[in-house]
């Protein structure tokens, strides 16, 4: 019997991939990466949309205590299929490490400079702290479950129920679609007049 995380990872793929499958989009390009942290290198995974031509908006995925497990990697891959350059640290980050990662993502050659953060499990508590940090270079955030109280935010934050917390595919799909629509809207380049 598959684990709950395997089920949720599969659900992410089912929620994110139908449109991709219909359009026959190429899968995301995924690789292990290192980037500069505060006094040491950080390690994780990067997923780049397979359809990407030029820089794309970026998303930092903050997972729970398990770090880059199967569930978190499925989430990062699904975000890349949705059109976002995605960074998933291998282990949970401190606030300073997360801010360094946001700075690195904002200036990464694959990214547009617009960066969001998505938190799941224990990683969701860091989203609120980052959204209040003036030096985070953050455009918006999405919290799936997790922390109920957060500091006053300087950027828009979308709070959604925990993903994978039940067996209601319709509710899960609705939350996923809300998150993708929110990220797409918030990470759009400024309109020229």
Give the location of each predicted region.
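Primarily recognizes the serine-hydrolase "nucleophile elbow" in alpha/beta-hydrolase
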Residues: 103-153
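Serine-hydrolase catalytic-loop signature spanning alpha/beta hydrolases and amidase-signature enzymes
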Residues: 66-68
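C-terminal catalytic histidine-bearing segment of alpha/beta-hydrolase fold enzymes
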Residues: 158-193
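Short beta-strand element of the alpha/beta-hydrolase
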Residues: 55-64
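Cap/lid segment of the alpha/beta-hydrolase catalytic domain
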Residues: 88-97
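N-terminal cap/lid segment of alpha/beta-hydrolase-fold proteins
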Residues: 22-51
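Short amphipathic alpha-helix adjacent to the substrate-entry channel of hydrolases
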Residues: 70-89
